[in-house]
């Protein structure tokens, strides 16, 4: 197993280019299952564990893929298997994205329940509800979602999500583009990742109105075509890199971005005392001498993203005073806090709010990654901690950050990747 060994105390400064978005890559790769007409060429696809897992799932279904230099080519011409097995789905909840495309194209899909799903209210219910609104029959047995279409073809319908869900909106879109008639989606997620998926489907030949809003209208079509497409930048990686500079007192320019998509995050950096300048495709951040404590509330886009909440908590450990961080998307997304406190942070949890008391001099020690964004917060803390920090179980980090230690080292960090035996 890999760990990152971080020698703290270096300023993160320089110029870097953002990677392609993981959260956009996964649904557009899933959308390649909608047609066997040609080969897709997808550019700016990041080299990540989740991308590898997803392409393995496509291979299992019968698709052919090649990946070289951040370009992924996919042909779904020979897809035959309609079952997504637990062995692959358990590695990544986003595997549920294959449900909509397979059901719409083939009339049947059998997808293992993602690991950790319990009966009762759970996020996957929204995906299943959307398929049922389009005429699918859903049964769950022996750990599998079995989806069929009694009428042979999905029918346009009206889908209203009780809460905003990026994943369920994406699945509904991919199913609706091949449905017969018109589908409307109310309270759709409006995140840039969904807007990009809409643009991808439109380029394939779909008709979608309301792109970028919470009300979508889709006219079903009979055939779609393979296309060449460039993925968008990863706004969470970009935000994490900005936070790395801010927490260490550095100055950074991140290229290859769309600042408009990061307005909520950039606004908070300004409130924290940073100087932020933007162009059409770059963000420059200059750190203040003292960080100002800044409260954030994570909510669906265009608000501050839940995927930046953990990194913001790490940053606020160095601010002069107390900050309140509230997560209204995932109320209990605070697994990183005990580990940050092990490094010397002073953070309290009250229900869905973290109270960060700063500034605290952090001291390096061993800490354990628990999930993707929690891992990023520990790396940020390690950059500013005194001494050496070892971040264990970085396979979580590798799921969503492309060569993060190489990028940070190019900006002045001292991070090495080492093997370790977790049981010794």
Swiss-Prot record:
Q: Which GO terms describe its molecular function?
A: UDP-N-acetylglucosamine 1-carboxyvinyltransferase activity
Q: Which reaction does it catalyse?
A: phosphoenolpyruvate + UDP-N-acetyl-alpha-D-glucosamine = UDP-N-acetyl-3-O-(1-carboxyvinyl)-alpha-D-glucosamine + phosphate
Tell me where in this chain the PTM 2-(S-cysteinyl)pyruvic acid O-phosphothioketal is found.
Answer: 117
Give Gene Ontology CC terms.
cytoplasm
Q: Where in the cell is it found?
A: Cytoplasm
Gene3D superfamilies associated with the record:
Enolpyruvate transferase domain
Give the keywords, sorted. Answer: Cell cycle, Cell division, Cell shape, Cell wall biogenesis/degradation, Cytoplasm, Peptidoglycan synthesis, Pyruvate, Transferase
Q: Name one GO biological process term.
A: regulation of cell shape
Under Enzyme Commission nomenclature, its number is 2.5.1.7
> Superkingdom of this entry's organism?
Bacteria
Main localization of the protein?
cytoplasm
Q: Where does UDP-N-acetyl-alpha-D-glucosamine bind?
A: 93, 122-126, 307, 329
Q: Where does phosphoenolpyruvate bind?
A: 22-23
Question: Which sites are catalytic?
Answer: 117
Q: Could you tell me which Pfam families the record lists for this protein?
A: EPSP_synthase
Q: What does this protein do?
A: Cell wall formation. Adds enolpyruvyl to UDP-N-acetylglucosamine.
> What family does this chain come from, according to its entry?
Belongs to the EPSP synthase family. MurA subfamily.
Name used for this protein in its record: UDP-N-acetylglucosamine 1-carboxyvinyltransferase
Its taxonomic path starts at: Bacteria, Pseudomonadati, Chlorobiota, Chlorobiia, Chlorobiales
Q: Which gene encodes it?
A: murA
